[in-house]
Amino acid sequence: MVWGLDMVGPLRKGPGVFTHLLIAVDKFTMWIEAKPITNIRSEEAVKLFLDIIYRFGVPNCIITDHGTNFTRKKFLDFSDGYSIRID
């Protein structure tokens, strides 16, 4: 199972002061998961992928654009802990 992960934003502030969208796409089924977020820290990506793991299972690989929020220690430790390759 391979997922793509990207961040969209900044957006105009709406209800709840959300400024970005975190988007994950299953590359086989093209299923989309989107989560509005208020900050772009790597913790938000970890939370989204924990939810994905609980519902769909552990992916083999996550494809990112290597943005700083996806290359920080917290996200890399999370992916190492689940043996997820980051491309």
Which role fits each region the language model picked out?
Residues 1-87:
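Retroviral integrase
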